[in-house]
Amino acid sequence: ILDNRIEKISNCFKQASEEYGYKAENFIIYPIKVNQMRPVVEEMINHGKKFNLGLEAGSKPELHAVIGVNTDPGSLVVCNGYKDESFIELALLAQKMGKRIFLVVEKLNELNLIAKMAKQLKVKPNIGIRIKLASSGSGKWEESGGDASKFGLTSSELLEALDFLEKKDMKDCLK
């Protein structure tokens, strides 16, 4: 079932990419909070290799679990959720060990922590930014988007983040 679903998601995205001329590389990311059982995660990883499957960790315990799983060196690990110094340190140490870690900034203060820890550990972090769109979608999750969303940076915070990265000579870390 898992193999079939990974393949179906990949094929649907490939078809949509061709239809709309989307050329960028894409990845399927499995949030391990869905099911943290090692056999399930390993099955996702093993079958997902040919589909650029990566893992998402939304907490420090999840990040420990992700680091402990044998993934491909090119496989993405996306770090979302609340990030304190110890979470960021663990993520950056995993990056130094060869994991392909991306820290997704959801609050402006996280950038300071990432910059501080990266400097201490002498590592160039991979940074993503979650933005809070002014408009919201429709359907079940309509109220969790737009200005009412509790996650992501506003457009003015995004500009502050870009200024911060430029001043810290870290603009190239934004992926």
Language model regions located:
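N-terminal hydrophobic targeting/anchoring segments and the immediately downstream early-domain regions
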Residues: 1-13
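Active-site-proximal beta-alpha core segment in soluble small-molecule metabolic enzymes
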Residues: 21, 26-175
